[in-house]
Design a protein with these regions (language model features):
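Structural signal for conserved beta-strand scaffold positions within catalytic alpha/beta enzyme cores
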Residues: 72, 88, 136-138
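Conserved phosphate-donor/acceptor-positioning beta-strand/loop module used by diverse small-molecule
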Residues: 48-50, 79-100
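ATP-dependent small-molecule kinase phosphotransfer cores
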Residues: 1-78
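A generic structural signal for alpha->beta connector loops
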Residues: 43-44, 83, 131-134
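Alpha-helix N-cap/helix-start motif at coil-to-helix transitions, marked by capping-box chemistry
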Residues: 3, 90-91, 117
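Arginine/glycine-rich "motif VI" loop of SF2 helicases in the C-terminal RecA-like domain
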Residues: 78-80, 128-129
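NTP-dependent small-molecule kinase module
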Residues: 94-158
Length: 158
């Protein structure tokens, strides 16, 4: 389901914010039920590049949808499964967009600069609200230093 959603986003087809939210939640519910939970039940460790915090940042802060609604839908979609650690590589919005490059984007990549600023504020607010489960790093540090700091934190968890 996630792959189909990615194709839809890359198609450039206009989508209402609430439709976008519901599609992400449906894809997440399926992923958690079919892949993540069974893997965790077998003792596995899951590393994901997007989860509920991304939905809150993009749909809540970026698109302006009701954050309480997003929290409720996230809880339903995940069965309350939360990450032990969320890493936020904090970069100025302009730097992050420049790093993305000029290749083909999706509905998010092609959004106005203010949209990306709202998302950045969202991630910052989420990290500040739960500092024990977030690791905020300067995304302009050398990659080796970023890796070192992430690994040091991960080792305290696994």
């Amino acid at each position: 389901m996630g792959q189909a959603l990615r194709r839809l986003l890359k198609s450039g087809e206009a989508m209402t914010p609430i439709s976008e939210l519901m599609l992400f939640e449906a894809a997440r519910a399926q992923l958690v039920q079919q892949v993540i939970r069974p893997f965790l039940d077998e003792g596995g460790v899951v590393i994901a590049d997007r989860y509920t915090s991304s939905t809150m940042a993009y749909q809540g802060y970026g698109r302006g949808l009701d954050r309480e609604l997003i929290e409720r839908l996230d809880r339903e979609a995940t069965g309350g499964l939360k990450p032990d650690l969320t890493v936020f590589l904090d970069l100025p919005v302009e730097v992050a967009l420049a790093r993305k490059g000029g290749g083909p984007g999706d509905n998010f990549d092609d959004a106005p600069l203010d949209f990306h600023r709202r998302i950045h504020r969202g991630y910052s607010a989420l990290a500040a609200s739960d500092p024990k489960s977030w690791l905020v790093l300067d995304g302009q540090l050398p990659p080796e230093e970023i890796s070192r700091q992430i690994w040091a934190r991960v080792q305290t968890i696994i």
